Amino acid sequence: MATHPRELDSTVCSIARTMELIGQPWTMLVLRDLFNGVRRFDELAEHLGIARNVLTRRLATLVDAGLVTRRSYREPGQRARHEYRLTQAGHALRPVLIAVMAYGDEHLAGPEGPPVQLEHADCGAPVTVRLECAEGHRLDPTARLRVRPGPGARFRWSEPVSD
């Protein structure tokens, strides 16, 4: 019988961890609206057309994860309500949303084209998400990438190999 080769444990995965957080229905759309400046609970519910109980759960998850902060406000003569703002960790998801949007624009938009376009507010140029290595080489989506263990990797032994 041969030795037991080590394999990376795929249960410890940054993609899986991130999808646990943002992969729930409505979560990406809530984040989209927060990026676009919709902050108040009632406005989010109306803009998204989402059930209030679902929105409450999604926002609570985002607050608990540190992606969003919740702040009370009160209009004169009204009861206290809440508004939500992205944290630095929440803002770090912007490239993810833009990449999802770019995929939809390229592969799912109707014949008339994308419904919205993003422009850099300072110069008016279109906003894109690029895949590149640390040396600045631009990569296309089919570029070969090597997967190697990172500092947080865990290993498991694979099944014994018969001779």
Language-model-detected regions and their locations in the chain:
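C-terminal regulatory/oligomerization modules of transcriptional regulators
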Residues: A102-D163
